[in-house]
Structures are given as structure tokens and as C-alpha cells.
């Protein structure tokens, strides 16, 4: 079983050190997403958003339980670097399910990070797979590798007979929403275009970490076809969330206090409507991970 890792992100040498550093980067991504406050409809330090069965303590326990697995996924990728790409998802599936069980044990059955287990499991394993083959690691190469690993995933897992449909499969059939599977199959196209790019642009303009994450979150909420929202409020709920996020983004660049007030009001709106953009929260964590991956790899291989 994986052992606990520290939050500190240090660069070391060798596959083991690289895997540990990437695992810590993934953990830090989840911590930053959780601590960002206020987040519309989401669990944060101020409240539980539109959720009734979880709070910030639940999320912290979940992060502590799943984070040790991230470096393990990297190691599995290294060990399985010779596994044909079309078989690799099956190769790591049992490990992903074991990580999910660790999450559920820590949260007493509450689903806090199932999407993140899927996304970061793939990202860390893909990084290990590339490293095991002597391929360079970068944001672009890791996303491309995830896309190769997940080729055909939407068709295989969402186009099932009606009797076998899960909630995610029903959303695909009803609205064409592909959720986390589609995002992974695309190589995290939404996260890259509407999370990584806005975050890096905000940082380049001199915004601090928190402001940059808020701007990235609003961009993701404006563009992501979030299945978490649709499962609660239908397409009408999704349209409401996207429209409000776009309205805030179209405002002239507000002061920190003004943006915080806007986000707090947006939070209350989504709490009243029982809408949670959990998919966009997952993508925000992925976006920060990808935005910082290249710098981390450079430090590790220097």
C-alpha cells in the first residue's frame, strides 16, 4: 500500500524521485483547489456549497487518503511502459479502484474525489509510462499520452445497452455529455484551453496565485459542460451557471474585494439552486497541475 507523502514539492533525481515530485504536485493541486475561497456552489473554507454530505474536513481526509497513490500510479506507468497502449487502461484499472476504496474509507462512503482519482491516476501513470520509455515529459506529451491511453473510451463505456446505463451514460444519451471520460480522451482539452491558459495569462499580468485560480475557475465554469451541474439542474442549470460565469468574466477587471463579493454572491445563487460545478473544480486542480508540470520536470532533470 502506498505510504503518505509530504506536501512540499521538491525536485530530486531518478525515476523514484521524479514520481514522488509529480505525486506531490498532484496533491498540492487538490489542496489549492479545496482551500480557494469562495468557490460558487463548491466546498471551501467558508461553507459546503451545494453539498449536504461533505465539508472541508471531509475533503482534507480524502486528499490525505488518495495522495500517496499518485506516485504509485507513476511507478505503475514506468513498470507498464511496455504494455500496449490499448491495454494500459485495463492494466491500471484495479489500482484506480483501490485508490477509490481508500477515499471512501476515509470519507465514510462520501464521493469527494472520484473524478480526481480518475484524472490524476491517468496523468501520473501516463507520465510514468513516458519516463519508462525514455520519452521527454511535458504538459503536451503527458496530455497526448493520456489521450492515446483513453482512445475510444467514450464509445466503449458510454455506448452501452439501455439496461446497463449509469448516470453518466444517461447524460451522454440524453445530452451528448461525455464527462470525465471525454475530457481524458481529448487529452484534457478543456482544462488546457480554459484552465491552464487563463491561469498562466493571469499570472503573466501580475495576478497572484489566488486571483489567477479564480479567473481560471470562472473560465472553466463558463465553458465546461459540467455533468455534475446537469445531474442536479438539467441543461437549464448548466446554462445558468455558464451565463453567470461569462457575465462576471465580461466585467471590467474588478478589484480583489469586488471579485470576492461577486464570487460570494454567485456561491449563494448556486447554493439556493442546489447546483455544484464539481467537474469544473476537478478541472481546476488538473489545470494547476498541468500549468506547473513543465517547471517541475525541468528542476527534476537538471
Swiss-Prot record:
Keywords: ATP-binding, Nucleotide-binding, Transferase. One of its GO terms (molecular function) is ATP binding. Its EC number is 2.4.2.52. It comes from the Bacteria. The keyword Iron does not apply. One of its GO terms (biological process) is prosthetic group biosynthetic process. Belongs to the CitG/MdcB family. NCBIfam families: citrate_citG. Gene3D superfamilies: Triphosphoribosyl-dephospho-CoA protein. It catalyses: 3'-dephospho-CoA + ATP = 2'-(5''-triphospho-alpha-D-ribosyl)-3'-dephospho-CoA + adenine. Coiled coil: none annotated. It comes from Albidiferax ferrireducens (strain ATCC BAA-621 / DSM 15236 / T118). This is Probable 2-(5''-triphosphoribosyl)-3'-dephosphocoenzyme-A synthase. Pfam families: CitG. InterPro entries: CitG, TriPribosyl-deP-CoA_syn_CitG.
Amino acid at each position: 500500500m502506498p505510504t503518505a507523502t509530504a506536501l512540499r514539492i521538491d525536485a530530486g533525481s531518478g525515476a523514484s524521485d521524479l514520481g514522488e515530485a509529480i505525486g506531490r504536485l498532484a496533491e498540492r493541486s487538490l489542496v489549492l483547489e479545496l482551500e480557494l475561497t469562495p468557490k460558487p456552489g463548491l466546498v471551501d473554507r467558508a461553507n459546503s456549497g451545494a453539498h449536504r454530505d461533505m465539508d472541508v474536513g471531509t475533503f482534507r481526509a480524502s486528499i490525505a487518503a488518495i495522495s500517496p497513490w499518485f506516485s504509485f500510479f507513476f511507478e505503475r506507468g514506468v513498470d507498464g511502459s511496455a504494455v500496449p497502449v490499448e491495454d494500459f487502461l485495463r492494466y491500471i484499472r484495479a489500482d484506480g479502484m483501490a485508490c477509490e476504496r481508500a477515499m471512501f474509507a476515509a470519507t465514510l462512503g462520501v464521493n469527494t474525489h472520484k473524478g480526481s482519482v480518475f484524472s490524476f491516476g491517468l496523468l501520473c501513470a501516463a507520465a510514468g509510462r513516458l519516463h519508462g520509455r525514455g520519452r521527454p515529459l511535458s504538459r503536451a506529451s503527458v496530455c497526448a499520452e493520456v489521450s492515446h491511453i483513453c482512445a475510444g473510451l467514450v464509445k466503449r463505456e458510454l455506448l452501452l445497452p439501455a439496461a446497463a446505463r449509469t448516470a453518466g451514460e444517461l447524460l451522454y444519451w440524453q445530452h451528448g455529455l461525455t464527462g470525465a471520460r471525454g475530457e481524458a480522451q481529448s487529452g484534457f482539452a478543456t482544462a488546457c484551453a480554459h484552465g491552464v491558459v487563463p491561469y498562466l495569462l493571469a499570472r503573466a499580468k501580475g495576478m497572484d496565485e489566488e486571483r489567477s485560480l479564480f479567473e481560471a475557475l470562472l473560465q472553466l465554469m463558463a465553458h465546461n459542460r459540467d455533468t455534475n451541474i446537469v445531474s442536479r439542474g438539467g441543461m437549464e442549470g448548466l446554462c445558468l451557471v455558464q451565463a453567470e460565469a461569462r457575465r462576471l468574466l465580461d466585467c471590467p477587471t474588478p478589484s480583489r474585494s469586488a471579485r470576492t463579493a461577486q464570487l460570494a454572491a454567485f456561491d449563494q445563487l448556486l447554493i439556493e439552486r442546489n447546483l455544484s460545478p464539481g467537474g469544473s473544480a476537478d478541472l481546476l486542480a488538473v489545470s494547476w497541475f498541468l500549468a506547473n508540470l513543465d517547471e517541475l520536470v525541468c528542476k527534476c532533470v537538471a
